[in-house]
UniProtKB/Swiss-Prot annotation:
GO terms for biological process: translation. InterPro entries: Ribosomal_Su5_D2-typ_SF, Ribosomal_uS5, Ribosomal_uS5_bac-type, Ribosomal_uS5_C, Ribosomal_uS5_N, Ribosomal_uS5_N_CS, Ribsml_uS5_D2-typ_fold_subgr. The gene is rpsE. It comes from Mannheimia succiniciproducens (strain KCTC 0769BP / MBEL55E). This is Small ribosomal subunit protein uS5. It comes from the Bacteria.
Length: 166
């Protein structure tokens, strides 16, 4: 699970999973390792990376580099989400909704790590279907990327924020 946390400048890095995989060839098995990591600035930017190498440290390093390259911006509202969102990736489905101050991050495993590094402080969430960490992380990132702020909606509709919010 999310067991390594480092500060790289202003970025928080979390290691979610390390897995040993093998390729069978004529001469036997070739072992290698995969690593799944998330990186965020704690203020609405988050990304994930998946690295594979013959040694664990090299796999983690590759995953961190990919995570830094694949960051997205998330429109947060006072440390929580703008509105309830759903995300899907293959067999994993996630549902997240805003929570009041003091609730904390109610999420399991891989989803919790993504929300923590993104800077979300209060959220209620649930993962349905497959709980494979890679798919849950991708579904969570999908849900966060699809979340729209009232300013974004107002700009798209050509209205003011007050008209959108009623």
């Amino acid at each position: 699970m999310a067991n390594i946390e480092k500060q790289a400048g202003e970025l928080q890095e979390k290691l979610i999973a390390v897995n040993r995989v093998s390729k069978t060839v004529k001469g036997g098995r070739i072992m290698s390792f995969t690593a799944l990591t998330v990186v965020g600035d704690g203020n609405g930017r988050v990304g994930f990376g998946y690295g594979k190498a013959r040694e664990v440290p090299a796999a983690i390093q590759k995953a961190m580099e990919k995570a830094r390259r694949n960051m997205i911006n998330v429109a947060l509202h006072e440390g929580t989400l703008q509105h309830p969102v759903k995300g899907i990736h293959t067999g994993s489905r996630v549902f997240m909704q805003p929570a009041s101050e003091g609730t904390g991050i109610i999420a399991g495993g891989a989803m919790r790590a993504v929300l923590e590094v993104a800077g979300v402080r209060n959220v209620l969430s649930k993962a349905y279907g497959s709980t494979n960490p890679i798919n849950v992380v991708r579904a969570t990132i999908d849900a966060l990327a699809n979340m729209k702020s009232p300013e974004m909606v107002a700009a798209k509709r050509g209205k003011t924020v007050d008209e959108i919010l009623g």
